[in-house]
Amino acid sequence: MPTSADRTARPTLMKTAIRIFELSLGEMLWSRRSVFLALLGAAPVALAGLIRFAAFAGPAALPQVNGERLDGSVLFGLMIWLLYLRFIVPVLGMFYGTSLIADEVDDKTITYLFVRPIPRGAVLVGKYLAYFVCTALLILPSVVLVYFLVVPIGGGSLGGTFPAFLTDLGMLAAGIASYGALFAWVGARLKRPLVIGLVFVFGWEPGVLLFPGYLKRATIAYYLQGLVPHAMPQDSAVSVLLQAFQEMPPVALSLAALGGVTLIGVYLAARATESREYVLEQ
């Protein structure tokens, strides 16, 4: 027979986080925000279809760099960097990350979560895990379709580029995790988190990366770009240009920095959720 102490014991953080994850994942997948962001993820697929059609109509339509016509694998690498890592992943991380707690406050449902005898930080951790899975499910079909549409252009081999494709998926996962963790902390700690996220994604990161110096190290994109040349063919003109005109951090440093941003961001977000008093506006 369970004792009264057993019945009143607080659930552990991990058990609570898993339960919150199960409840939140379905809500995120079927939310209006996910429908809009799924359409955003469909944009690269439409672009890839246009590129494939142009290549079928005439190879001369494909872009060139220094007189060298770009093949499908290089075009795919550029799309991963310019469309996914520099735009779609930060936007998804910003919209989902800042809303993990803010949506509960705006909907005045946060009280129902916090009056229960569960660790507050577990609510944030569970919602963050749901964000990661939801975002991965939104992006993965888009990336796979773009891969099959673009890579065969110019005689590219799907089998030969598959290891690089796995590296691209790893970069996307690192970006989803790190941006989400950063914006989860912003959403849990600060007011007007979406405004701050917009300034960071569309103002701070693009602006700082254009100038030499140490400020670019205070961006996530700087460490993500350190992984990009290693996912692209090393003998391609685009890879040479990336290495020549941009300062690339070592791969080990990039992985350590992205992992640190993820772990510290989730920890600080959970701590902020535990300590902050949320005032519901009437």
Regions found by a protein language model. Name each.
Residues A42-S99, L124-R189, L194, L209, ...:
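Secretory targeting signals
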Residues L25-G41, Y131, R192-L198:
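Alpha-helical transmembrane segments and their helix-start/interface "positive-inside/aromatic belt" motifs
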Residues M14-L29, P163, T167, A221, ...:
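Membrane-interacting alpha-helical segments
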Residues G93-G97, I110, L145, Y179-L182, ...:
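Hydrophobic/aromatic residues in alpha-helical transmembrane segments
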Residues S275-Q282:
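Short cytosolic juxtamembrane segments of multi-pass membrane proteins
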Residues T3, I51-F76, R189, L194-S275:
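Terminal transmembrane helical anchor/hairpin motif
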Residues P2-A38:
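Aromatic- and glycine-rich beta-strand/loop motifs that create alpha-glucan
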Residues F21, Y96-F132:
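Helix-loop-helix units of permease transmembrane domains in multi-pass membrane transporters
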